[in-house]
Structures are given as C-alpha cells and as structure tokens.
C-alpha cells in the first residue's frame, strides 16, 4: 500500500479541525465531540477519519463540501475557502460564530427586558429615569452620522477603506501586527478621557477581513471612551448596547453606504454578488451579507 505523508493536504487537516470546533460550538460544550463524530459527517470509518485529521486525505470535492455544509448548516462558500487555503482556522471559526448582533431583537431583547425590570438600579443612574426603550436604543442614525463624519474627515471616496489611513486621524489609536499572538487581537490602554491611548495588536502580518472588523470595533470603543467629537452626539448606554453599536459601527465603516450604493451598480448580476462586493471592500462574505441586509432595510 502506498504510504501517504502526514499533513500532505494541510488545508484538509484545517477543515477537519474546523468541523470539530463547529460541532463543539453547536453542542455548546454539553456533548464531548470526538474525532469520529467529524468522520461520521461523511460516513468515514476510523481509518479514513484519521487520514482526514492528519491531512492524508484531500477533502475538496464540491459534493463532499456540500454534505458538510448541510450537516453543519453553514454557507458552503466558507468550506470551499477553507479547503482552498484562503481562510485559516481562526478566521473560519469567527465566521461560523458570526459577527454578533447588529440590533436588539428577539431573545436578546426579551432577556434584557427581564433583567431591566428585575434590577433597574443596575442600569439607571441616580438622577436618570429612562424607559427601557430609551436606555437600550441602538440609535443607528447617530452611528451613521459618526461614520459619515470620519469618512468625510479622511476624504475616503473609493472602496476599500484602509484602516491604517483612518488611524492617521486618531494618533492615540495604533494598530500593530504581532506574529506571536495566540488570540486574534490584543488591546492595551493607557490613560483616560482625551488622553486615552489604545494599541490594538492583531495576529499575523496580514490583516484578514475578520481582523479588520475587530479593529474597527475597538476604534469605536476608543472614540466613545476618549469622548471624541465624532461620537459626542451619541448618548451613553449600557455595555450590552455598546457592544451592538460597535458591531454596527464596524460594518458601516468598512462598508460605507455611499460606497456600497456605487459598487452595487458595478457588479455583474450573473455572478455571486456577495462574493464580488466582499472582495471590493475587503470584508468577509458573512459580514457583506449582514451589511447588505442592513442596507436594504435602511437604504444607507
């Protein structure tokens, strides 16, 4: 029998590792996921499963990836990118988990309402008596206004938006690449208020789309915590709302409404629109999907 070198197909090994992590996320840690659970997705016996895990088996046939996509309820385009080596493990897991909430709806809203009425003093200041709707208002128009002011200040007119150029507008906000990081980003702060300095280190020398999103989120938090004039019109809010606002800000900054409208007119409708736009704006397909839904609902 011909002996196949271990890790001959490293992207297949990454795909295996991702599938195992995705199953673990699905079961929320309540079920111990073993290697054979991953192999079972494709009906593999223990030997084939082991070969896949060790990168001895090349998994990239479209029909096979579709089977995995159906089992994990995931966009097959992400699996195709993993199998082709375009997306690494950390980025794939981030994509699978999603980019977080961009609005306060459904179960999240209901849970916050219960907590608010059970313990209102946790959210209300001494002289503040705001309603739930006022206190937990995402205030999208104000976030849009902040993004528009930054885009105008930097005179950005063409996609993609370069984060290093945006950082030039804010000398106290610094981005640094760091190959030694084990997490996607690491944030360090110094000082407070107008003197606040923030350094965001990101993993690797190449700022991948998901890292751009995470850095943009940190920029919003910096603007809020340093009382920047760009966000002076935005009312303070609970941490739960700040997190959603940061997601919304990042999406709007990386894919500004005016630029998106312009680029949508250029795309080839006979091909995958999401893929085309994600490549233009240097964002992931998942974020572009979210941003397009947001754009269609709000027209900006």
PLM-predicted stretches and their roles:
Residues 50-51, 66, 80, 289:
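Key DNA-contacting residues within the recognition helix of helix-turn-helix
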Residues 34, 45-48, 61, 75, ...:
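Short coil turns linking two alpha-helices in DNA-binding domains
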Residues 61-78:
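DNA major-groove recognition helix of helix-turn-helix/homeodomain DNA-binding modules
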Residues 1-37:
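A short, Lys/Arg-rich alpha-helix, primarily the initiator
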Residues 43-60, 81-85:
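Recognition helix of helix-turn-helix/homeodomain-like DNA-binding domains
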Residues 32-40, 68, 274-278, 288:
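Short alpha-helical "recognition helix" segments of helix-turn-helix
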Residues 3-4, 81-130, 184-188:
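Short, charged recognition helix plus adjacent turn
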Residues 2-10, 129-300:
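Conserved binding/catalytic microenvironments
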């Amino acid at each position: 029998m011909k002996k196949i070198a271990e890790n001959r197909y490293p992207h297949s090994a990454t795909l295996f590792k991702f599938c195992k992590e995705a199953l673990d996320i699905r079961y929320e840690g309540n079920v111990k996921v073993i290697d054979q659970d991953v192999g079972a997705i494709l009906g593999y016996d223990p030997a084939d499963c082991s070969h896949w895990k060790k990168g001895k088996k090349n998994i990239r046939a479209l029909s096979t990836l579709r089977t995995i996509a159906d089992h994990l309820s995931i966009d097959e385009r992400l699996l195709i990118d993993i199998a082709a080596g375009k997306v690494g493990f950390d980025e794939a897991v981030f994509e699978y988990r999603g980019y977080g909430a961009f609005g306060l709806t459904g179960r999240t809203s209901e849970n916050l309402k219960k907590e608010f009425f059970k313990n209102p003093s946790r959210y209300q200041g001494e002289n503040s008596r705001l309603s739930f709707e006022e206190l937990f208002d995402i205030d999208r128009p104000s976030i849009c206004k902040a993004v528009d002011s930054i885009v105008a200040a930097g005179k950005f007119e063409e996609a993609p938006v370069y984060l290093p150029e945006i950082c030039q507008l804010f000398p106290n906000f610094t981005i640094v690449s760091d190959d030694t990081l084990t997490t996607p980003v690491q944030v360090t702060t110094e000082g407070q208020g107008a003197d606040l300095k923030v350094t965001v280190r990101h993993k690797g020398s190449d700022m991948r789309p998901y890292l751009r999103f995470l850095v943009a989120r940190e920029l919003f938090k910096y603007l809020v915590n340093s009382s920047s004039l760009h966000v002076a019109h935005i009312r303070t809010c609970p941490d739960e709302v700040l997190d959603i606002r940061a997601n919304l800000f990042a999406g709007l900054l990386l894919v500004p409404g005016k630029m998106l409208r312009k680029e949508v007119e250029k795309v080839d409708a006979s091909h995958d629109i999401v893929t085309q736009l994600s490549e233009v704006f240097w964002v992931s397909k998942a974020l572009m999907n979210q941003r397009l839904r947001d754009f269609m609902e709000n027209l900006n």
